[in-house]
Amino acid sequence: VVIFLGTVAHKTSPQRPDRLLIRLRHLVDNVEQLKIYVNDLDPELLPAPQDVKEHCAHSAFACFQKAKLKPANTGSNKTIISDLVTQLRRRLPATKAEKKQQSLVKCPSCDSYEKKTPKEFLE
């Protein structure tokens, strides 16, 4: 602890990046990579959350993660697609605000979202 002009400053690491923000950036990169292989995905329709209210963003993202993005029988790309989908399914770090809101807010179920093709789903 350093005392400077009557104020107490804790000696900690510099502002560490927000874990949630880093994770979201990583997920956006994964989605961009999946778009390259969209023609190699199983054409099953998927629930695609759109126009999600801020307080339901975590719930909508959970629906996105639960979607059955599956590689079609495409040989070598199958492994790449499977790895990207696995990375998409990793849990997001929770925030304190989310923990409070989860008990207060009712958000739409995954089944209530319009179903779209994998290409539209990844947009």
From Swiss-Prot:
Location(s) in or outside the cell: Secreted
GO MF term (any one): cytokine receptor binding
GO cellular component: extracellular space
SUPFAM superfamilies per record: 4-helical cytokines (SSF47266)
Keyword Repeat: no
Signal peptide annotation: 1-10
Glycosylation site residues: 77
InterPro entries, sorted: 4_helix_cytokine-like_core, IL-15/IL-21_fam
Cysteines engaged in disulfide bonds, as pairs: 56-107, 63-110
Biological processes per GO annotation: cellular response to virus; germinal center B cell differentiation; positive regulation of immunoglobulin production; positive regulation of natural killer cell mediated cytotoxicity; T follicular helper cell differentiation
Keywords in alphabetical order: Cytokine, Disulfide bond, Glycoprotein, Secreted, Signal
PANTHER family per UniProt: INTERLEUKIN-15-RELATED (PTHR14356), INTERLEUKIN-21 (PTHR14356:SF2)
Task performed by this protein: Cytokine with immunoregulatory activity. May promote the transition between innate and adaptive immunity. Induces the production of IgG(1) and IgG(3) in B-cells. Implicated in the generation and maintenance of T follicular helper (Tfh) cells and the formation of germinal-centers. Together with IL6, control the early generation of Tfh cells and are critical for an effective antibody response to acute viral infection. May play a role in proliferation and maturation of natural killer (NK) cells in synergy with IL15.
Family to which this protein belongs: Belongs to the IL-15/IL-21 family.
Protein name per the record: Interleukin-21
Species assigned in the record: Peromyscus maniculatus
Gene it is expressed from: Il21
